[in-house]
Design a protein with these regions (language model features):
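Short alpha-helical interface elements
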Residues: 20, 41-45, 64, 75
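A short, structured beta-strand/loop element
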Residues: 27-61
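Short, flexible active-site loop motifs that bind/organize anionic cofactors or intermediates
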Residues: 6, 49, 67
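C-terminal structural segments of small proteins and small subunits
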Residues: 55-81
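N-terminal first-folded block
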Residues: 1-31
Length: 81
């Protein structure tokens, strides 16, 4: 897990979603008003709801959750960005 200072200030949501899709996540953007989306790891069917605006503080905790739940690290995600 990188330090907060090592993370980019803000990542575009579409770019982040594209990287997650390349890693094998399924993305569910249906329902609601569009302020959140759900990523699903097909191997375990576990899911995580993510806020659409990925500020640095939100990104840090999101990456922490992704690593704990799915075992996918920031270095793997950043390679796909």
């Amino acid at each position: 897990m990188p330090s907060r200072s090592a993370l980019p200030g803000e990542i575009k949501t579409r770019k982040f979603i594209r990287a997650l899709r390349r890693l094998g996540f399924a993305i569910d953007m249906s329902g609601g008003d569009g302020s959140h989306f759900k990523i699903i790891w097909p191997k375990t069917e576990k899911s995580l709801t993510i806020q659409s605006k990925l500020r640095k503080d939100v990104l840090y905790y999101t990456l922490k959750e992704i690593e704990e739940k799915f075992g996918v690290t920031w270095s793997q995600i950043s390679k796909e960005l």
